[in-house]
Amino acid sequence: MEQTYQYAWIIPFLPLPVPMLIGLGLLLFPTATKSLRRMWAFQSVLLLSIVMIFSMNLSIQQINSSSVYQYVWSWIINNDFSLEFGYLIDPLTSIMSILITTVGILVLIYSDNYMSHDHGYLRFFAYMSFFSTSMLGLVTSSNLIQIYIFWELVGMCSYLLIGFWFTRPVAAKACQKAFVTNRVGDFGLLLGILGFYWITGSFEFRDLFQIFNNLISTNQVNFLFVTLCAVLLFAGAIAKSAQFPLHVWLPDAMEGPTPISALIHAATMVAAGIFLVARLLPLFIVIPHIMNFISLIGIITVFLGATLALAQKDINRGLAYSTMSQLGYMMLALGMGSYRSALFHLITHAYSKALLFLGSGSVIHSMETLVGYCPKKSQNMVLMGGLTKHVPITKNSFLLGTLSLCGIPPLACFWSKDEILNDSWLYSPIFAIIAWSTAGLTAFYMCRIYLLTFEGHLNVHFQNYSGKRNTPLYSISLWGKEGSKISNKNFRLVTLLKMNKTGRPSFFSNRVYKIDENVRNMTPPFLSIPNFGNIKTSLYPYESDNTMLFPILILFIFTLFVGFLGIPLNQDVDILTKWLTPSINLLHKNSNNSIDWYEFCKDALFSVSIASFGIFIAFFLYKPVYSSFQNLDLINSFFKMGPRRNFYDKIKNAIYDWSYNRGYIDAFYGTFFIVGTRKLAEFTHFFDRRIIDGIPNGVGLISFFVAEVIKSVGGGRISSYLFFYFSYVSIFLVIYYFLNL
């Protein structure tokens, strides 16, 4: 076993040859390298598979022996400073390694077909392999210096992948936004690292925790300074894991290819922030104020992410806000000290969200056969619907991921989310109410995404939903500001509404659907992908190829069974608790991990009831209009009541405006930070040119003009010089006389 741990240093470096060789090949032998591009994809999968097997071996040994291994090399040693590099293998490292490698392998296999049309195929695989290397290096780091180095590499890879299609202005802006937002958090992380080094004199986790705990117990530190340093450390996690208020980059990150979103949201970038807080939890847990702050940020993010997901029309952005909300649950659990629950939810959410994103990519891939390559159309749920019979495997997989995220037993997220919800009651009733309410919102918006995508008719074939020939295709304002040139009225939250004779929207009414004769020519190809120029569109989507379906089916199985890791089946301790024993003992001495099944079932019944209520509301509002509900006069009469209807519309519109406008947070940042910075820059430029440069330039000009005046006065005649001389002497004498009176 010792020998296995000694070779664990190769974990982050095994995937590294692929991006290096691809880069050299494209520089030196571009034609040959491109002709063998499938070989490079195979090597990426092969090397990451070796890392996965190695990580599984380490995990099995840790479960059986509850051991922690650390190896350190000292590079610079003197009396005052030592720089050490090494690797740490503990339960957190092994969990993250398995998560990164399993999801990474499936995403790479999926991407082989998804990116086959793209000229950037090799560049994509180089970025993805380097992304995996950076993340594996992050989770195996044994000190804060290594953490920061790999932290920045993860940020760089995310910048490259989000802006993969950099010729699209939207993608270029999105990667810049992600880069700048994360720089704010990374600067705080750097200051926090330096602050704790100044306090403890060490970067190594083991020494850092021990020295800091001793200083706290003997009251030898300034608590205000310590809290400030902890907040700065946490700022890095806030930015990386898209927590409020540095969450604004996450929905824009959907401008990259969908497999990138699956990797970022499941196992790499956003998981890095959760990993950092979990790694530093022994440091944070002795500072009560920072733990309260972590839980506060978590609960705000939980609710904010759920509300922002309510009215998204882009399928990937809806899933992105879902990720934000679920990461908030993990951060809330860490702030409450529920280390095991946070990591449990990290595992279950990773596989469920990877399943959803790969399913979303399969849907987008199928829609591109109808609308061509145009993300605004292929990812727009207004053009979807009725996909059940066309993509049945994708539909069933997406449904399973949806139900898992909703918290329906016995799927993965049910077990982990319930633990966090139950712990929240013990921590704060207010936080618990918000967390449980958000569970209902989660069920609502996830079911909404599913219904709009797969149920009903294939909406891309319909010219409009009002029976008017001149109404443009994007006339339904529910789906955003996509540009109705005729109708300016807002139909929000509830899909497929129609104006009746009184000018009010009606929920259920007969519609005349018009087939768009120009459906084949709806979308011009995008310039960055020339292969799409000659793509032939069809009238109906079709199921993705087996290369894309295989990873989806594997994640389908994971989502079904991974939740049982945390459930004690015919044994005293579940596998996850046994796995995490060294870390749990470090945080909570003599902790009791037994489960009260009666309390669990009671709380589970309550949580499932809330989720079921959210699903019912989604079905009530978003079930296709041709369903049996349209004949229920009771429902129609209820919504046609005057005052009640007006009140309902106001609430609906307010929710829609909040959600569609991203809570006005982006607008606030744009007004007060971007515009403010520009105004400050303009003022600084004016001050520099007119004041700083103006003073010396003005003195020079005045001297020049005075000299010119004096020069013009003197004409070279001695009589003139004598006249001015006696004049000045006379003036001087007069002044002197009056001063001495």
From Swiss-Prot:
Family the UniProt entry places it in: Belongs to the complex I subunit 5 family.
Gene encoding the protein: ndhF
Cellular location(s): Plastid, Chloroplast thylakoid membrane
Subunit-level organization: NDH is composed of at least 16 different subunits, 5 of which are encoded in the nucleus.
Biological-process GO terms, alphabetical: ATP synthesis coupled electron transport; electron transport coupled proton transport
Record flagged with keyword tRNA processing: no
TM segment ranges: 9-29, 40-60, 89-109, 125-145, 147-167, 185-205, 219-239, 258-278, 289-311, 327-347, 354-374, 396-416, 425-445, 549-569, 605-625, 721-741
Name of the protein: NAD(P)H-quinone oxidoreductase subunit 5, chloroplastic
Any one cellular-component term (Gene Ontology): chloroplast thylakoid membrane
Keywords recorded for this protein, A-Z: Chloroplast, Membrane, NAD, NADP, Plastid, Plastoquinone, Quinone, Thylakoid, Translocase, Transmembrane, Transmembrane helix, Transport
EC code(s) of this entry: 7.1.1.-
Cysteine-cysteine disulfides: none
Main localization of the protein described in the UniProt heading: plastid
